[in-house]
Amino acid sequence: MKKQFAVMFCLLAIFACLVGCSGKTESLFPSAFVRAVGQEKADALKTLGTTEQALSDYTVDVYGKTADVQLSFDAYRGDETSAGKLNYAELTVPCTPNDDGFSYMRTCYDKLEKALGGPFTTDVNMDGVSAEDDTDTLFAALQKNAGGENVCALQYQWRGLGENESLLYLYYYPNENGSARVKLTFLPKERAQIP
């Protein structure tokens, strides 16, 4: 009887562990995200890892095709002590594309700043790059390394630049006093796809 009880206890413990582990995995992909991409794609995403970068790359593939005249901002919030436990939220800031890529970006950035309750301080002086500069120079100025930090990332699919269409990351770091610092990272389109 004691042996049977011990076996049952062990099986129960294993089951509890499995349930607990699967619960933790699911928390990496909130229901809003799973509903948006579908369970099959969400499961496939798990094989890519649970890093912010994997989620961001995947989101480009999912949302990029529909981001025509609007910028879809997908926010992943987390911190180093709860790595991977990211809350999913979506913020859409309307922005009409125009022929001037710089003013288009500047206008959309201003709208993002207002929507998030800015002003922000930024690693890139947006006003320091003139509209006359070619896009390559502008993009080079915006290219920053996120340093692997997993605090909060805002991203949008850049549309309206023809063959230069790419992804611009805005890494948003909230501070205790309510202000924020923004890092901008330009990611070429070919690097923004899932392998």
What positions do the PLM features span?
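Bacterial signal peptide processing site
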Residues: S22-K24
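An acidic-aromatic pocket/loop used at catalytic or ligand-binding sites
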Residues: P94, V129-P195
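A glycine-biased structural micro-motif
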Residues: R35-Q39
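Long, charged/polar, surface-exposed segments that mediate recognition or autoinhibition
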Residues: A67-L154
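Post-signal-peptide N-terminal segment of Sec-exported extracytoplasmic proteins
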Residues: E40-T66
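Positively charged n-region of N-terminal signal peptides that target proteins for export
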Residues: M1-V7, L11
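C-terminal motif of bacterial Sec signal peptides marking the signal peptidase cleavage site
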Residues: C17-G20
